Amino acid sequence: MTINNLLEELNPAQRKAATTDSQNTLVLAGAGSGKTKTIVARAAYLISQGVPAKEIQIVTFTRRAASEIVTRVESHLGLQAEGLRASTFHTFCLSILRRYPKVFDLKGFNVIDRDDQIMMFKLLRGKFEDKRAKEAAAKNSQTSTGKTITFQRKKAAQTVSEILPKPKELVDLYSYSRNTQISLKNALYKQLPGFQPAYNEIKAVMKGYEAQKKERHYLDYDDILEYVARYLNSDDWLLERVTENTKYLLVDEMQDTNPLQWLLLQPFIGRTQLFCVGDDAQSIYGFRGADFENIHSFKERVPDAEVLTLDLNYRSTQEILDLSNWLLDRSELDYKKRLTAHRGEGIKPVLHSFGNEFDEARFIVSDLKKR
């Protein structure tokens, strides 16, 4: 299939986005509006216009999505698309770390995943428990005239499980603080308010985790992002090298980016052609620190950006979209786009309430049998 055939498959709004010549572009893509198809068309269009595929970097949130985009571009352009890069934010940053290790003063490092982090925090909690046990034993024993007198406390001491969050919760708290770029104290208030009295103990555990990583030359996923983001914002030589190889940056699912990822994108503004796609009316990674301001305030942060809208929905009927539009109209945020159904009219949605998920499942099965 030629690029002309691909462009002919797009609707006018998709085609305008795919072929824009703006330096910076934000595409507000409503649900089911062909977002991925538009990104594929954008990459294919750039290559067809003479842009070397190796100068295009696409970043998204899953390896599967990245692989799908590259495969679809290759299906349209064949060998012409060879060298096109699509990856997650972490893989993109990891490639920079490994290509320029001396810049980051990293002579050698090992990447640890979430399971490794959980195990490290589990061991740190164990050390904390041992320390408390020794302190409690010292307090409960007093020596007088060569004899040891043991006093029975009225109330049993809290266990470490009661004082500190679970290892998984500590990992999530640590990551949330890094990704939102807020202090540990504020992250604790937002994520685990019930553990605020243990702030000093949690802070000590976090310091222990940082010390162990440094000692063992470990980098977790948050380190990978923050190392690269910080250095790109402060090291002109590194930024020059990276932007030489990345002249076109396409960002998928912009609404799910967090403050740390925005910090990573900032240095590219003005040096690369930035093309961001996302839905300003949805976000599924709030628990990871996703910040809707990255998309809602994009025009303020990048004043020369062109903002385009994809509002033709290919997934739902108009009755479903009318309900969605009605909800968005009542939001405090200003949503300018209104989704229109390509499929036309349909059945008006009906609200059903259930006592539990099993009743819900039984209803769905019963309803499907009737259709």
Enumerate the language-model features and the residues they cover.
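Conserved helicase NTPase motor core
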Residues: E8-T19, Q23-V27, A65, R85, ...
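P-loop NTPase Walker
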Residues: M1-K107, E240, D322-N325
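Conserved P-loop NTPase-based nucleic-acid remodeling module centered on helicase motor cores
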Residues: E55-T60, R64-P165, H352, V365
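Basic/charged alpha-beta structural segments of nucleotide/phosphate-handling enzymes
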Residues: I118, K122-Y218, D236, L274, ...
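Phosphate/oxyanion-binding loops and surfaces in catalytic or ligand/nucleic-acid-binding neighborhoods
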Residues: H76, R99, V103, K127-K131, ...
